[in-house]
Every structure is written in C-alpha cells, then in structure tokens.
Amino acid sequence: MSSKEQKTPEGQAPEEIIMDQHEEVEAVEPNDSAEQVDPRDEKIANLEVQLAEAQTRERDTVLRIKAEMENLRRRTEQDIEKAHKFALEKFVNELLPVIDSLDRALEVADKANPDMAAMVEGIELTLKSMLDVVRKFGVEVIAETNVPMDPNVHQAIAMVESEEVPAGNVLGIMQKGYTLNGRTIRAAMVTVAKAK
C-alpha cells in the first residue's frame, strides 16, 4: 500500500482529512471576520444614534417654541382686546356722577309747573343724549327692579318686607349701576325684598 492509499482508522485517506479540515477552517474564518466589527462601522452607528437623539431634541424644542409663541400671540391679542374694551373705564367713571346729577335733577324737578317744563325737557334730552353716547361705547345701565338680586351687579343696601315682589328680588334702585362691555364698573345700590 502506498502512502496515498493508507487509510486512517476511520476509513479515510489522510488527504481527505486534510481537505475536510481545510474546508472547516475556511468556513470558520468568515464567521470570525463577521464577529470582528470594523471600529469605523461602530463609530458610524454611534454617530447615527446621537444624530437621531439630537434631531428628536431639536424637534421637541421647535414644537415647544412654536407653542410658546402661539400662547404669547393669543395672550397679546387678548390684552389688546381688553385694552380697547376697557380703555374708557376711567373716563366713564368720571361721567357717572354727571349722569347721576341729571337723574336727581329730574327726580326733584316740579314737572307740574309749566314754567319748569322747558328746563325739565332740556335735562331729559341732555340725559338721553349722554346715555346714548355712552351706550355706543359699551356702557349699559343696571336699573331693573323685580329681578333676582345678583351680587355681581347689585349692592344690597337694605332688606324690605314686600308682598308684591318675591323674596330675594330687587325691590328698588337707590343708585343706578353701570357695566362696560359686560364688566361691572359700578354696582347698583338696591333694596331687596324679603318675605313677611
């Protein structure tokens, strides 16, 4: 028997064993190289993760800033609207005593006296003109009776027993109240009905 023909105990020729082992080594080598990651690839992967995190943070920051700007714009619009609505408040507060004086003049005027008729008519027209002007700018008079007492627009001065007006309702107006665009600038001083 030649050396090529020599058989190993397993029944294989030595060349066959060497070839089998060589194939196994070749099969193992690609696996080893796959396990060894190129450091550049690892660095690229880390940088991609960092980039994604930075983009997420920037997106969140941009959204937060947009929301803050929208809130600021809305608050500014509301402030401007309130400034327009209530810019006249001080001026109206100065006019209220004049309107009250005209009201009192009409209350005490002798309307039966023909000599006073022209003066009473002049006061009535002046008061009407004044109220028309302030109504144009959002001022409303609070002077209704027989309505439920509302602490937002009424200030109770006294409680008076009454059979005609339900308890808790406004019985009489001592001094008119006024609102400016829905905001009470002076509460009406009222008497409130109570049950007997």
Swiss-Prot record:
Q: What role is this protein assigned?
A: Participates actively in the response to hyperosmotic and heat shock by preventing the aggregation of stress-denatured proteins, in association with DnaK and GrpE. It is the nucleotide exchange factor for DnaK and may function as a thermosensor. Unfolded proteins bind initially to DnaJ; upon interaction with the DnaJ-bound protein, DnaK hydrolyzes its bound ATP, resulting in the formation of a stable complex. GrpE releases ADP from DnaK; ATP binding to DnaK triggers the release of the substrate protein, thus completing the reaction cycle.
Q: Which UniProt keywords apply?
A: Chaperone, Cytoplasm, Stress response
Q: Where is this region: Disordered?
A: 1-40
What is annotated about its quaternary structure and interactions? Homodimer.
Q: Which GO terms describe its cellular component?
A: cytosol
* Family according to the record: Belongs to the GrpE family.
Domain of life, source organism: Bacteria
- What does the entry give for GO biological process? protein folding
Can you name this protein? Protein GrpE
